[in-house]
Amino acid sequence: MVRASSSKKGGSKGGDKDDAESKQRKRLKTLALDNQLLSDSPAKSHSSLKPSKQVLKHHGTDIIRKSQRKNRFLFSFPGLLAPISAATIGDLDRLSTKNPVLYLNFPQGRMKLFGTILYPKNRYLTLQFSRGGKNVLCDDYFDNMIVFSESWWIGTKEENPEEARLDFPKELAQAENTEFDFQGGAGGAASVKKLASPEIGSQPTETDSPEVDNEDVLSEDGEFLDDKIQVTPPVQLTPPVQVTPVRQSQRNSGKKFNFAETSSEASSGESEGNTSDEDEKPLLEPESSTRSREESQDGNGITASASKLPEELPAKREKLKSKDSKLVQATLSNLFKKAEEKTAGTSKAKSSSKA
């Protein structure tokens, strides 16, 4: 019974601590929402960062993730930090609870940041790109983050051991070192540029696309409405060049070639009839060249060619016969038939001679 009573008392004390932590957590969460560190709805970025050369080089490669034994937390501060040198910026305390505290060290004293552990819907990771462009290594993967939404100035430990809230010194309000740069990472957004230089306006070199509300364009079923989507025609900077179409024909007009293969008998007849003229002519000779040669000749040449016509007619007839004759494939049956015809012809000649 004593143990039961003692456990009840301990449970009541633990419940009071849990209630205090939950109240502190709710207060810090509402404060982060008021300061626009967090948002219930997904944020719409007005300006997106351009991908670097390494990201474009590793486009489409595999992301390799190694197992992690230690829990890693992502910090979200209410402002931008610009450390002068690489060193420890502070100490993290009460990490075992849901409301950790971070102490930032300054030459004038310390700053106390109150935070709470939250589990966002977005996932954050850090990537390490290889030089060859084969793969990408995922160093850290953050499922949870610590949002520091409230900051106190507590001074030094000797002056303020109880860590009561003090006024910020005037020296921290004035920026002494101006060599820091917030153009990389999340500092490249348009909101950071407006805060850094509100008086100087920047002229964008690229034309921004028109903003279209998705709620007006989408129907109740989630489909796009054709009536509300406006498409602007592209602007032609240079006038189009008109090119006249040209028909390119692969045939040679006015030229006729003779590729017919003549038989052995026709070739022998041609060699006997026209040994002087046909041997000198090329195999592939266009008719235009022959016409020009005949026109350039004198009257004597014309009569001579006319006298040679009857001699060339039988040779041309043999050519036509060779063209009209069907090509017969040399097979074994054809060869045997030819051999039988030859033997029959020789036997007839022998019988006639004997008679």
Curated annotation (Swiss-Prot):
Cellular compartment(s): Nucleus
Any single GO BP term: root hair initiation
UniProt GO MF annotations: DNA binding
Region: Disordered, residue numbers: 1-26, 181-215, 229-355
Keywords: DNA-binding, Nucleus
Compositional bias of kind Low complexity: 230-246, 260-274, 344-355
Tissue expression summary: Expressed inproliferating and endoreduplicating cells.
Phenotype of gene-disrupted mutants: Plants have no hairs on primary roots and have an extreme dwarf and seedling lethal phenotype.
Organism domain of life: Eukaryota
Function, as annotated: Component of the DNA topoisomerase VI complex involved in chromatin organization and progression of endoreduplication cycles. Binds to DNA. Required for endoreduplication beyond 8C.
Quaternary structure (record): Interacts with BIN4 and TOP6A, but not with TOP6B.
Protein name as catalogued: DNA-binding protein RHL1
